[in-house]
Amino acid sequence: GCIPYGKTCEFWSGPWCCAGKCKLNVWSMTLSCTRNF
């Protein structure tokens, strides 16, 4: 499967985001899937 928006993710190992990219959330300091591509 894929990781939905807002959920935590990793750059280097899947599964990857359903949409958007895996980016650092500056507020929570965790990697999460973004809404956009």
From Swiss-Prot:
GO CC terms in record: extracellular region
Task: Please give the chief subcellular localization of this protein.
Answer: secreted
Reading the lineage from the top rank, the first entry is Eukaryota
| Residues annotated as signal peptide | none
> In which tissues or organs does this protein occur?
Expressed by the venom gland.
Q: Name one GO molecular function term.
A: toxin activity
In its record, the post-translational modification comment is: Contains 3 disulfide bonds.
Where Phenylalanine amide occurs, the residues are F37
Q: Where in the cell is it found?
A: Secreted
| Disulfide bond entries | C2-C18, C9-C22, C17-C33
Q: Which UniProt keywords apply?
A: Amidation, Disulfide bond, Ion channel impairing toxin, Knottin, Neurotoxin, Secreted, Toxin, Voltage-gated sodium channel impairing toxin
Q: What else is known?
A: Negative results: does not inhibit the sodium channel Nav1.8/SCN10A sodium channel.
- Job of this protein: Blocks the Nav1.2/SCN2A, Nav1.4/SCN4A, and Nav1.6/SCN8A sodium channels. Reduces the peak amplitude of the sodium current and negatively shifts the steady-state inactivation process. Does not shift the threshold potential of activation or the voltage corresponding to maximal current. Does not change the reversal potential of the sodium current. May act on site 1 of the receptor.
Q: Member of which family?
A: Belongs to the neurotoxin 01 (U2-agtx) family.
Give the comment on domains.
The presence of a 'disulfide through disulfide knot' structurally defines this protein as a knottin.
Name of this protein: Mu-thomitoxin-Hme1a
Organism equals Heriaeus mellotteei (Crab spider)
